[in-house]
A protein has these predicted regions:
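Transmembrane beta-barrel strands of outer-membrane/channel proteins
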Residues: 15, 29-35, 84-88, 140-144, ...
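Residues on the lipid-exposed face of transmembrane beta-strands in outer-membrane beta-barrel proteins
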Residues: 15-21, 70-74, 86, 126-130, ...
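Repeated loop/turn-to-beta-strand initiation elements of outer-membrane beta-barrel proteins
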Residues: 23-29, 78-84, 134-139, 180-186
Length: 217
């Protein structure tokens, strides 16, 4: 008999150092290690008679993740602020723990243990803020990620690892500060309308709009 394990992260540590080569430039370089137990990911099962997805299975596995990364922060007076950061990840997977070892899919599901499904091998965040005056500002907030693999059970081929297209999410917005504590903003997310797979066959929303209020206290 087997049972679903709990999902938790007993270790998630990071160490690094900061450099300030100029008064307006700060560079943060770091490395990290994390160990995940019972981490969840989605596995897609296709229909026998078509390419459509019949259902998704939520599976769990244990894995280790190492990362190296850097962040760059630049500002010019109180007018322009740039933040760029990126990570590269290295994974080591343990056998998938939520599959019945007696299942005929047990061996194929591991697929040599070479992939952590749905997780990117690299990601980049980039944000630009421009303060027009003390009240108005505009910004661009962007996210990129790639080298993601998905587990797909096809018929009659069997299980395989399928590469997902890179994530390119470009967002732009503006903000008006009413006072020191209160501001309103509007944002257009994914203005290229470039949908990506959150997991195989399940796409993101595409272009959409967001309005809100910020309150500092």
């Amino acid at each position: 008999a087997w049972s679903e394990p709990r999902a938790y992260t007993p270790v998630d540590a990071q160490i690094g150092f900061k450099l300030r080569p100029a008064r307006t430039l700060l560079i943060d370089i770091y490395g990290g290690y994390a160990y995940f137990i019972g981490a969840c990911n989605m596995h897609a099962e296709q229909r026998y008679d078509s390419e459509s997805i019949a259902y998704y299975s939520l599976w769990q596995n244990d894995y280790q993740r190492w990362k190296v990364g850097a962040n760059l922060h630049y500002h010019y007076r109180d007018i322009v602020e740039i933040n760029v950061g990126g990570n590269y990840y290295f994974y080591q997977q343990e056998p998938l723990s939520s599959i019945d070892p007696e299942s005929p899919h047990f061996q194929s599901a591991n697929i040599k243990g070479t992939h952590i499904f749905d997780r990117p091998n690299w990601d980049i965040n980039a944000r630009l803020d421009v303060h027009i005056n003390s009240k108005w500002s505009i910004y661009s907030e962007n996210y990129f990620a790639g080298s993601r693999m998905a587990y797909v059970q096809k018929y009659p081929e069997g299980a395989s690892a399928v590469e997902l297209k890179p994530i390119i999410s470009l967002n732009i917005g503006g903000q008006y500060a009413i006072n020191r504590w209160l501001a309103v903003y509007a944002q257009v997310n994914d203005y290229l309308n470039r949908k990506h797979d959150i997991f195989y066959g399940y796409q993101s929303q595409g272009i959409h709009f967001l309005v809100g209020v910020k309150w500092r206290f």
